[in-house]
């Protein structure tokens, strides 16, 4: 199967509530990840696989996507947009774009997954098995937090299981699928439908659909939480996660054009510094994601945290495992630890939040 005869469908309609306050101003797939909108990494992988036609299924802040990617020509793609008037779920989102499909086969992606899967190999697997649906599956250390997808010795899916304390397999749904058009046409239109909880179990129960699982051992991460977002960004910077959108040397830091890093600042752990950001002397950034226009003043320590657009971090502040919203102003010597989230534009005075008594 030639990849140019395949459509790509990317579902990007979610509100990204677990990443608030960052997603109050931008959809999750548009947040800077290793200095680029996250979706750029996925679209670059799609283009590198030879797929040309992409449909973005949008809902939350849809105009942001078209403003960034336009017709897709800058990435070597042809991008079209379909907006949901109300949330339709994963299955409903697929059905909603059916009118834009040009081919009999479509590869569908959840737009918040960072993956290194070989897309051409996945399509070859689908074709060689003459499958109606193929799911990319990954193995995880603790599958109890996920729904499981067991397969038989011929790689055919035998069940779709909800979260359980005693899962029979470590294989989980990786959020990437290959559909034949005749299956997409069976998905109900105009209402919310879950592909995981409704479409796939119904197809399996009917018994007339060949559903296969492609077990993949490449890099995979769901970017839905601050912890995973930070880790995924750092893995891109360090070259652990692949992306055709990132060129050049990978290492402990990625400093984008227009950023200013003072002598004596230490940037490690896959830290990324956005355009126009200023990093003061004596600072220590370890696994930090610094968006464009941020000012980090002297002596700050920022670890495994995300600092939103245009925020200011005052001298000797400590931020660990936190999320700072766009335009927030964190005063000198503040300490924000373990899950702290500061909303956009909030001002914290010098020493306003401390976890220790020394000042």
Swiss-Prot record:
Optimum pH is 7.5. It catalyses: alpha-D-mannose 1-phosphate + GTP + H(+) = GDP-alpha-D-mannose + diphosphate. Disruption phenotype: Essential for in vitro growth. Knockdown of the gene decreases the cell growth and alters the integrity of cell wall and cell membrane. Optimum temperature is 37 degrees Celsius. GO terms for biological process: cell wall organization; GDP-mannose biosynthetic process. One of its GO terms (molecular function) is GTP binding. Keywords: Cell wall biogenesis/degradation, GTP-binding, Nucleotide-binding, Nucleotidyltransferase, Transferase. Pathway: Cell wall biogenesis; Nucleotide-sugar biosynthesis; GDP-alpha-D-mannose biosynthesis; GDP-alpha-D-mannose from alpha-D-mannose 1-phosphate (GTP route): step 1/1. It is an enzyme of class 2 (transferase). Its EC number is 2.7.7.13. GO terms for cellular component: cytoplasm. Pfam families: NTP_transferase. InterPro entries: Mannose-1P_guanyltransferase, NTP_transferase_dom, Nucleotide-diphossugar_trans. PANTHER family: SUGAR-1-PHOSPHATE GUANYL TRANSFERASE. Belongs to the transferase hexapeptide repeat family. Catalyzes the formation of GDP-mannose from D-mannose-1-phosphate and GTP. Plays an important role in the synthesis of different glycoconjugates which are responsible for cell wall structure, virulence and immunomodulatory activity of M.tuberculosis. Could be the potential target for novel anti-tuberculosis drug. This is Mannose-1-phosphate guanylyltransferase. It comes from Mycobacterium tuberculosis (strain ATCC 25618 / H37Rv). The lineage of its organism: Bacteria, Bacillati, Actinomycetota, Actinomycetes, Mycobacteriales.
